[in-house]
UniProtKB/Swiss-Prot annotation:
Principal location listed in the UniProt entry: cytoplasm
Catalytic activity: a (3R)-hydroxyacyl-[ACP] + UDP-N-acetyl-alpha-D-glucosamine = a UDP-3-O-[(3R)-3-hydroxyacyl]-N-acetyl-alpha-D-glucosamine + holo-[ACP]
Organism: Klebsiella pneumoniae subsp. pneumoniae (strain ATCC 700721 / MGH 78578)
Gene Ontology biological-process entries: lipid A biosynthetic process
Protein name in the entry: Acyl-[acyl-carrier-protein]--UDP-N-acetylglucosamine O-acyltransferase
UniProt-listed Pfam families: Acetyltransf_11, Hexapep
UniProt cross-references to HAMAP family, sorted A to Z: LpxA
Function: Involved in the biosynthesis of lipid A, a phosphorylated glycolipid that anchors the lipopolysaccharide to the outer membrane of the cell.
Pathway: Glycolipid biosynthesis; lipid IV(A) biosynthesis; lipid IV(A) from (3R)-3-hydroxytetradecanoyl-[acyl-carrier-protein] and UDP-N-acetyl-alpha-D-glucosamine: step 1/6
Family: Belongs to the transferase hexapeptide repeat family. LpxA subfamily.
Localization per Swiss-Prot or TrEMBL: Cytoplasm
Entry-linked Gene3D superfamilies: Hexapeptide repeat proteins, Udp N-acetylglucosamine O-acyltransferase, C-terminal domain
Length: 262
């Protein structure tokens, strides 16, 4: 079903069964599959392919040669009807690829709201992106990677399968991330190592001086005290009881499966 207010260029192909919302713009030479839903106000510039069981929210901008919902690159994939879900107000730039999930990974690749995926970024099967993340040019997320909110991944950086990247993390360009990155941390290198707290990012997002100081103290306990992770955990939990902004560290420790960058 195509809403009467939507525009579909004469050279675009929209397969029967696709749901195209109000004021959607589908530019020249785009291809939209039968099991695709595109929300109100979203724009496909030109030469965009949206395939598979894919749901795209409102007011997204998707640029030339992006490919969304295509068959993933997991050799175990056998054609199951797995999905891609994309939220609202995302900017997906030229040649970005977002692959559908796998049965083994829960069947869903999910992108939240207000994200920017720059040219040639790749989001593999079963990845989860939160809100307001940035993937710079040629950033690559392997399968099952999870990014919390406000994560920045620098250009030409690769993130290993199953890694978890905490909120407000900034990973520098040309890095290789092979383990989990706790929230608020700046990381860089191959393999990525911690380089301090993302203070500028926290200031821009309205964190108070007191909150930033507490986060820095938690970082020092984790990385500068000489303590093992197991020794640092209870002290960070005690700090979180006094400063709620530190709680994401505690929550992150419970989620981490690949170990923390050191």
């Amino acid at each position: 079903m195509i809403d009467k207010t939507a525009f579909v260029h004469p050279t675009a192909i929209v397969e029967e069964g696709a749901v195209i919302g109000a004021n959607v713009h589908i530019g020249p030479f785009c291809i939209v599959g039968a099991n695709v839903e595109i929300g109100e106000g979203s724009v496909l510039k030109s030469h965009v392919v949206v395939n598979g069981h894919t749901k795209i929210g409102r007011d997204n901008e998707i640029y030339q040669f992006a490919s969304i919902g295509e068959v993933n690159q997991d050799l175990k994939y056998a054609g199951e009807p797995t999905r891609v879900e994309i939220g609202d107000r995302n900017r997906i730039r030229e040649s970005v690829t977002i692959h559908r999930g796998t049965v083994q990974g829960g069947g869903l690749t999910k992108v939240g709201n207000d994200n920017l995926l720059m040219i040639n970024a790749h989001v593999a099967h079963d990845c989860t992106l939160g809100d307001r993340c940035i993937l710079a040019n040629n950033a690559t997320l392997a399968g099952h990677v999870s990014l919390d909110d406000y994560v920045i991944i620098g250009g030409m950086t690769a993130v290993h399968q199953f890694c978890v990247i905490g909120s407000h993390v900034m990973v520098g360009g040309c890095s290789g991330v092979a383990q989990d990155v706790p929230p608020f941390v700046i990381a860089q290198g191959n393999h990525a190592t911690p380089f301090g707290v993302n203070i500028e990012g926290l200031k821009r997002r309205g964190f108070s001086r007191e909150a930033i100081t507490a986060i820095r103290n938690a970082y020092k306990l984790l990385y500068r005290s000489g303590k093992t992770l197991e020794e640092a955990k209870p002290e960070i939990a005690e700090l979180a009881a006094q400063h709620p902004e530190v709680q994401p560290f505690v929550d992150f420790f419970a989620r981490s499966t690949r170990g923390l960058i050191r």
